[in-house]
């Protein structure tokens, strides 16, 4: 499976060292093992999970510097927060989901892999925004969570003055961006060029929508 992962990473333009891939594959195996007991994901096939969970989550990694403070909203079983943290260990990551059992799993993974600078917290984003500094995060990510309009409303108070929202979308990403154009301008953000890609096994279409605060906001 190590060679398989390396091959697929190459096909999305990403290269990771063997120890990093080993940790990613351990996480994948552990997620599928726990899934038999507590229903973390609807995907049970390892090859499918490799592509649609692990590889999909890693598509965002080339957009990250590696030293940022990142919030992952609605992270579920730790997607994309845990693959991001494994691939970019210098990042400080807060992973948030409202489902307690999924956070328990993430905390287990963090302990086993000794992920320093990673916190998994069971709460709603709305309550988080009341307790965190308004300029806390360099990056907010969300994978297949909700409409871009809602994502921007949730992320805006949690991003610093150079912060970015990275919304991991399917083929509807471009349409959602167009629908939110006025809201984006009013909030003081600008959209970076869309990144379209296809997952290498299924051909499933993905769109990375990146919204960045305008300078001086």
From Swiss-Prot:
It is an enzyme of class 2 (transferase). The keyword Protein transport does not apply. Keywords: Cytoplasm, Methyltransferase, rRNA processing, S-adenosyl-L-methionine, Transferase. Its EC number is 2.1.1.170. The keyword Ligase does not apply. GO terms for molecular function: rRNA (guanine-N7-)-methyltransferase activity. It catalyses: guanosine(527) in 16S rRNA + S-adenosyl-L-methionine = N(7)-methylguanosine(527) in 16S rRNA + S-adenosyl-L-homocysteine. It is found in: Cytoplasm. Belongs to the methyltransferase superfamily. RNA methyltransferase RsmG family. It comes from the Bacteria. It comes from Syntrophotalea carbinolica (strain DSM 2380 / NBRC 103641 / GraBd1) (Pelobacter carbinolicus). GO terms for cellular component: cytosol. This is Ribosomal RNA small subunit methyltransferase G. Gene3D superfamilies: Vaccinia Virus protein VP39. Pfam families: GidB. S-adenosyl-L-methionine binds at residues 74, 79, 125-126, 143. Specifically methylates the N7 position of guanine in position 527 of 16S rRNA. InterPro entries: rRNA_ssu_MeTfrase_G, SAM-dependent_MTases_sf.
């Amino acid at each position: 499976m190590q060679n398989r992962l390396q091959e697929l990473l190459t096909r999305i333009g990403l290269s990771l060292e063997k120890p990093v891939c080993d940790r990613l594959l351990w996480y994948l195996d552990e997620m599928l093992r726990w899934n038999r007991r507590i229903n973390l994901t609807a995907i049970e096939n390892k090859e499918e999970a490799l592509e649609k969970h692990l590889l999909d989550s890693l598509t965002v990694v080339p957009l990250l510097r590696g030293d940022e403070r990142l919030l992952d909203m609605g992270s579920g079983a730790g997607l994309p927060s845990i693959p991001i943290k494994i691939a970019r260990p210098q990042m400080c990551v807060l992973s948030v989901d409202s489902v307690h059992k999924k956070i328990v799993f993430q905390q287990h993974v963090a302990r086993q892999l000794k992920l320093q600078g990673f916190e998994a917290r069971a709460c709603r984003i709305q309550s988080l925004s009341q307790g965190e500094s308004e300029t806390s995060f360099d990056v907010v990510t969300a994978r297949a969570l909700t409409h871009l309009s809602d994502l921007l409303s949730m992320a805006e108070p949690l991003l610093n003055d150079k912060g970015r929202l990275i919304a991991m979308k399917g083929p509807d990403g471009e349409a959602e961006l167009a629908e939110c154009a006025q809201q984006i301008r009013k909030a003081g953000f600008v959209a970076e060029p869309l990144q379209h890609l296809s997952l290498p096994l299924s051909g499933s279409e993905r769109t990375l929508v990146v919204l960045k605060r305008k300078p001086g906001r």
